[in-house]
């Protein structure tokens, strides 16, 4: 590397200042870049075998056919996807899907009209009306959920002291009209009757963490 004396360096700096920085880079940065040492930079081998191999890969498209071969090999492997809706993957016991109201084995409704679910719902999607029973307890006369407001946070299920309102395993409940997503008490109880066995098993599997 050529050694620059002080007068030569000053002259070079003056010429660079008059001509402006080359390609937008200062003389100092160019001088620093010239001292960079590239680590692990490999020069291509120029012997006959290496040159022949590179020419063969280029002319015969060996890399292309190797990639195509790898793609074709996946036709004979087990697929990583499933054929939905004919096949469905497993669901977690904590999955939060369509809502349901549960009953006791005797058929009596679990809900005690405490309205904790209505109070805790951040989306204000639950509306409850209740009346007293002859024995002094309370029963719901109206239990509505606006499913278009629900954010499926699961707070209603966590707040319920008797596991009455739950989010079931069903996630396929799309509708053609808005009105069909306004669930009333009868709809929620029917959901609970339909999925009671699965809901009870999921709650039992998760009881240690509740």
Curated annotation (Swiss-Prot):
Q: Which GO terms describe its biological process?
A: mitochondrial electron transport, NADH to ubiquinone; mitochondrial respiratory chain complex I assembly
Per UniProt, which keywords does this protein have? 4Fe-4S, Electron transport, Iron, Iron-sulfur, Membrane, Metal-binding, Mitochondrion, Mitochondrion inner membrane, NAD, Oxidoreductase, Repeat, Respiratory chain, Transit peptide, Translocase, Transport, Ubiquinone
* Keyword Cytoplasm recorded: no
Name where it's found.
Mitochondrion inner membrane
Q: Which cofactors does it use? A: [4Fe-4S] cluster
Where would you find the membrane-spanning parts of this chain?
Answer: none
Membrane topology, as annotated, equals: Peripheral membrane protein
- Targeting presequence: 1-34
Report which reactions are catalysed by this protein: a ubiquinone + NADH + 5 H(+)(in) = a ubiquinol + NAD(+) + 4 H(+)(out)
Assembly notes: Core subunit of respiratory chain NADH dehydrogenase (Complex I) which is composed of 45 different subunits. This is a component of the iron-sulfur (IP) fragment of the enzyme. Interacts with RAB5IF.
Write the protein's name. NADH dehydrogenase [ubiquinone] iron-sulfur protein 8, mitochondrial
